[in-house]
Amino acid sequence: MADESNTGPVAAAEAVAETQAPAGKRKSSSRRQRTAAGQVAESKTTAKPKRYSETERADKLNLIEAEVAQGNSTLKDAIKSAGISEQTYYVWKKSAKPADRKPEESVVAGDDLADLIQLDKENLRLRNLLSDKLRAENAELRKRLGLD
């Protein structure tokens, strides 16, 4: 019986160990609960992106181009009013099929080729005229300075 009443430092150490052990368990379990709650909240906030068909994309691109061409709004405002992001607009515009785009006229065609040839001839004539004029001017300046 004397041993039971003399618990002193051993009993105190056991009591401290018991109080620390449950506290450690509580902290780790609360951490698990917090991360579990965080994962649930994160999974609820992610939305599935909307996919547009090719015709919807073309319609939105045409709508944006029309608004900008009319001068009603800037490109950025037109993109926002269409309900898409700027990045999406540029990706769609880049990936648009060449058939969807307006056919551009070729720069050099029939009559344009003849005009280009005529302009080249005129350009050559003007270059020669300028070089002759500069040679004459240089010769006159040399005479005035007495370099010849």
From Swiss-Prot:
This is Probable transcriptional regulator SyrB. The keyword Oxidoreductase does not apply. GO terms for biological process: DNA transposition. Residues 7-23 have a biased composition (Low complexity). Residues 1-58 are annotated as: Disordered. The gene is syrB. InterPro entries: Homeodomain-like_sf, Transposase_8. GO terms for molecular function: DNA binding; transposase activity. Responsible for the repression of SyrM activity. The lineage of its organism: Bacteria, Pseudomonadati, Pseudomonadota, Alphaproteobacteria, Hyphomicrobiales. It holds the Pfam family HTH_Tnp_1. Keywords: Nodulation, Plasmid, Repressor, Transcription, Transcription regulation. Belongs to the SyrB family. The keyword Repressor applies.
